[in-house]
Regions:
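Basic, helix-initiating cap at the start of DNA-binding domains
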Residues: 1-23, 27-39, 53
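Generic hydrophobic, amphipathic alpha-helix propensity
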Residues: 8-16, 33, 58-62, 66, ...
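Hydrophobic alpha-helical connector segments
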Residues: 57, 71-98, 150-153
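Short hydrophobic/aromatic patch on the recognition helix
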Residues: 38-48
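Hydrophobic/aromatic-rich alpha-helical bundle segments in the mid-to-C-terminal region
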Residues: 119-124, 139-192
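Amphipathic alpha-helical segments used for helix-helix packing
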Residues: 84, 96-118
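Amphipathic alpha-helical packing segments from all-alpha helical-bundle domains
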Residues: 64-71, 83-87, 116-141, 151, ...
């Protein structure tokens, strides 16, 4: 049974994702994406009006993937929201073991774009959305200040990703998880 060939749009986005992850968004030109995806220039521009639109599509796809991985890891940790908060670090540990891991795509993109640009705004929106989700988990866990606990956990995630970008090792995610567990224990009273 033959599998269907991905659409031209999907090939372009997949190629751009790999290149942006490996070289950054400024380190990759449209001509390289066209050459490596095997599409004509007109095809790329039929799907993405400009490189900025392609970068936004990359960020949206990465957001969907990463938030899905976080949710899956949290749910796999069990029904207790305290365990789910610590479980997000399983997604981080798995990500750091992927070949070519270069840290957080959103942090990298923020560093390559001008504040106020669409891509920079999308990176900030992603970080806010993750913190909002963590805040809801912290609220469900009974944290006295859910937003503060979520902020601290998100900083642990970002710090572990930055460390693993320099030296990909699962120990960073494990250390961040243990630090998160201490914060969770302090912020969330034990349930009887």
């Amino acid at each position: 049974m033959s599998s269907a060939r991905p659409s031209a749009r999907d090939r372009i986005l997949s190629t751009a994702t790999g290149l942006f992850n490996a070289h950054g968004i400024r380190g990759v030109g449209v001509d390289r994406i066209i050459a490596e995806s095997g599409v004509a220039k007109a095809t790329l521009y039929a799907h993405f009006r400009c490189k900025d639109d392609l970068v936004l599509a990359y960020l949206r796809a990465t957001d969907t993937h990463w938030r899905g991985a976080l949710t899956e890891a949290a749910e796999a940790a069990g029904p207790d929201p305290r365990d789910q908060l610590a479980g997000v670090f399983d997604a981080l540990g798995a990500a750091t073991l992927r070949d070519g891991f270069r840290g957080c795509a959103f942090t990298r993109t923020a560093g390559e774009t001008e504040p106020g640009s669409a891509a920079h705004t999308a990176t900030a929106e992603h970080k806010r959305a993750v913190r909002a989700w963590l805040t809801e988990l912290a609220r469900a866990a009974g944290a006295a200040d859910p937003a503060q606990l979520a902020l601290r956990i998100s900083l642990l995630v970002d710090g572990a990703m930055a460390a693993a970008a320099l030296e990909p090792r699962p120990e960073f995610a494990e250390a961040a998880r243990e630090a998160a567990r201490a914060l969770i224990a302090e912020a969330c009273p034990a349930r009887v």
